[in-house]
Amino acid sequence: MNPGYRGRFAPSPTGPLHFGSLVGALASWLDARAHGGTWLVRIEDLDGPRTVPGAADDILAMLAHFGMTPDEPPVWQSTRDAAYTAALEQLVAAGLVYPCGCTRKEIADSLRAAHERHTTLAYPGTCRTGLHGKPARAWRLRVPDGCDAVVTFDDRWQHTQSQNLATEVGDFVLKRADGQWAYQLAVVFDDADAGITHVVRGADLLDSTARQIYLQRCLGVPTPEYLHVPVVVDANGEKLSKQTGATALERNDPLPALQAAAAHLGLANDGDLPGGTLDAFYTAATDAWARRFGPRAG
């Protein structure tokens, strides 16, 4: 075991595990095993209305059935309100966040006007200087101006990435108007708290990475290495998800789905990885992953 490597898979319990989720789980599991590291599972269940009762337990059971069991007990984000509150208070004390009273309609109108003027579509910072008589609805993190707003990072799959937070995003939400914690704060805090060193996830989250890196800097926590795998799309070119009708995985025979997931990750042509047993598949798949992303040798 390599104590210097800690990775994770972080599903949302909005339904059963489907093929798109399996690709993300397999990629993160293979990277952890190729590095001799620790693989964790975090249940991202902050969005109460979308959370399906029993889905988290079903996902964990399906992962185990497919041969992927976390090395430490799973963590549920819904139990971590006090920790997120402490992180926000740290940012408040540092003067890095501010309350925002803008409604969704006001923000949409502002972005529509900016589009018509062919200017930036980022949040315009309406409440940066005060609420102007409006009640506080959310908390936003200030992003810097000028060259300090540009966050550049090297992705292990997608190569060098860069985003100007000031012009492409604007001050972004850490706590929503409905009282829910925003994805960016919860993910950054949980990764740091768990000592995550390597994040392997779908490329649909590539756009969030610059924000997360900037927030890590604000909180004074380490930045992990990132690898964003291509997402699975349906016949219409949309990301395969529960919302687009993705079906649950076949529980009785995991190998065909695993082989297809490995093929999607470019590890082998469909069917080339050995069948027969999960152990044989995972040995071959881990070796194939290590040849591309290292460092299993030795």
Curated annotation (Swiss-Prot):
Chain sites annotated for binding ATP: 242
Enzyme Commission code(s) on record: 6.1.1.-
Binding-site residues, Zn(2+): 100, 102, 123, 127
EC primary class: ligase
UniProt KW Chaperone keyword: no
InterPro entries xrefs: Glu-Q_tRNA(Asp)_Synthase, Glu/Gln-tRNA-synth, Glu/Gln-tRNA-synth_Ib_cat-dom, GluQ/Sye, Rossmann-like_a/b/a_fold
GO molecular function, one term: ATP binding
Coiled-coil spans in chain: none
Signal peptide (from-to): none
GO cellular component: cytosol
UniProt KW Ligase keyword: yes
Assigned keywords, A-Z: Aminoacyl-tRNA synthetase, ATP-binding, Ligase, Metal-binding, Nucleotide-binding, Zinc
Necessary cofactors: Zn(2+)
Annotated L-glutamate binding sites: 8-12, 44, 183, 201
Note accompanying the cofactor annotation: Binds 1 zinc ion per subunit.
Motif 'HIGH' region in this chain: 11-21
Segments carrying motif 'KMSKS' region: 239-243
Family: Belongs to the class-I aminoacyl-tRNA synthetase family. GluQ subfamily.
Annotated function: Catalyzes the tRNA-independent activation of glutamate in presence of ATP and the subsequent transfer of glutamate onto a tRNA(Asp). Glutamate is transferred on the 2-amino-5-(4,5-dihydroxy-2-cyclopenten-1-yl) moiety of the queuosine in the wobble position of the QUC anticodon.
NCBIfam families reported for this sequence: PRK05710.1-2, PRK05710.1-3, PRK05710.1-4, queuosine_YadB
Name of this protein: Glutamyl-Q tRNA(Asp) synthetase
Organism: Burkholderia orbicola (strain MC0-3)
